[in-house]
Amino acid sequence: EDLAAVMNLFHQFRSQFKVQAFEMFTELALGYVLKHTDLQRPFETETPYYVLIEIENENDETLDAALGLLESGMESGAILDGTLSQTKEQSVQLWRLREDISEATSHYSPYKNDVSVRISEVPGFLTEMDQILKEDYPEFDVVWFGHIGDGNLHINILKPEGWNSDDFIEACHKVDDRLFGMIQAKGGSVSAEHGVGLVKKPYLHLTRSQTEIELMRQVR
């Protein structure tokens, strides 16, 4: 239901199971996937955040324990709803809800960033950055998703209808100033998965030492 519940669930699963994946995405992200694919909503309840969890199923006791943890979360209200894949096909359909986000948002000329923060900083970072974007750019749809297990987060800002590309990119660069400054304050990285690139190059000094930057130049 909220980021605190998401993080609590992550820590519970990580402490009890061999977690192979713990992916988070928002209702907004899911909405775009449902709009542009043939996928169906996995359950009726809408919630701000969704997680996909994959654990190593060592034996029947592992599955029973995982189900017990989910049931406990639903009883406490931390988890609003959930579903369990029973077949390979069901698993594929559930994973498409996360994996099809990039394709679904590609229709809106997204401005993309992939960043990382310490796991403990994820809730505060997302909350603060989301508030800044809502205040400064209320017309932007901002799609968040990522790998909670390693603090890697993807941010796709979708170009509003009626905006020309130059104005949109200029506005997004202003977002970068706020975003990367916050990343620096939280000891994160301005580039999690997809490399530095020309856009992020001026900000690399915020999260990398001069020695690290020189090494990156040498191995390029």
PLM features: what roles do these ranges have?
Residues 1-220:
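Noncatalytic alpha-helical scaffold of FAD-dependent oxidoreductases
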